[in-house]
C-alpha cells in the first residue's frame, strides 16, 4: 500500500476577499499562514513524513508548502514545481467578487462556471495584461499551452499527464509524496483517482489547509481517503467553500 497526501493551500488574500483567483499570483492571508502551520502540525501528530514534494508555480501553494515543511523540519526535501498543478484559470472572472458576480449572472450560471465539469468562464482577451503570455514564469510554454480560460475538464487534461508522468512513477517507487496545490487542480486529481462521474463533480469541495490522505494499492487504485483534523472544523471549512457565491444578506 502507498500513501499520498494532497493539500489545498491555506486561505489566500483573494479567498478572504471572496474573489475569483485562478492564475492570479496572490499570497496567503494571515489566516492562511495559520492554516498552513496547522497542516504541518496535523501531519506531524499523525506520524507522517515525506521523501519529496510537488507544487504549482503560484506563491500561495508554494508558501503553504514552505510553512508545512518548516513546521515538520523537512525544509531540505526536494520540491518539484509545475504549472500543471496551477489552479484552474478563471478567465475574465479573475479578480471579480464571487457574490457580486452571482448577483449579476445568477447563481445557476456561476455555479456552472465554478463547479461544472465542461463549462468555461468567459475568456481573457489576448491583449489583456492578466493573460499568462505576459507572465515570465510561463515564457517556456508554447501559446497553445497557455489558457485564457479553463473548465475543470481542461484542468484535468493538464493535471493527469503530470500525475502519470511525474508523480505516479515516484509513488510506485515507494516515495512518500506531499502535493500542495489548489482547489480545482486537487478536484481534478481526485476526480481521476476516484472515477467520479462528470455529473457528480459539482458537489466536491476541497477546504483550505486540511491534509487529504489517500491510501492506494499497488495499481494506484484508492483504498480509502480521509482528512486530518477536527471533523467539525473540516465540515465548516468545506461548507464555507460551497457557500462563497451566496447572495449578500
Curated annotation (Swiss-Prot):
InterPro entries: His_Pase_superF_clade-1, His_PPase_superfam, PG/BPGM_mutase_AS, Phosphogly_mut1
Residues at the active site: 9 (tele-phosphohistidine intermediate), 87 (proton donor/acceptor)
EC main group: isomerase
GO BP terms in the entry: gluconeogenesis; glycolytic process
Amino acids binding substrate: 8-15, 21-22, 60, 87-90, 98, 114-115, 183-184
Statement: the UniProt record of this protein carries the keyword Cell division: no
Statement: the UniProt record of this protein carries the keyword Isomerase: yes
Annotated metabolic or biological route of this protein: Carbohydrate degradation; glycolysis; pyruvate from D-glyceraldehyde 3-phosphate: step 3/5
Domain of life, per lineage: Archaea
GO MF annotation list: phosphoglycerate mutase activity
Keyword terms: Gluconeogenesis, Glycolysis, Isomerase
EC number(s) recorded for this UniProt protein: 5.4.2.11
Catalytic activity line of the entry: (2R)-2-phosphoglycerate = (2R)-3-phosphoglycerate
Site, Transition state stabilizer: residue positions: 182
Family per similarity comment: Belongs to the phosphoglycerate mutase family. BPG-dependent PGAM subfamily.
Record's function text: Catalyzes the interconversion of 2-phosphoglycerate and 3-phosphoglycerate.
PANTHER family membership: PHOSPHOGLYCERATE MUTASE (PTHR11931)
The protein's name: 2,3-bisphosphoglycerate-dependent phosphoglycerate mutase
Species of provenance: Methanoregula boonei (strain DSM 21154 / JCM 14090 / 6A8)
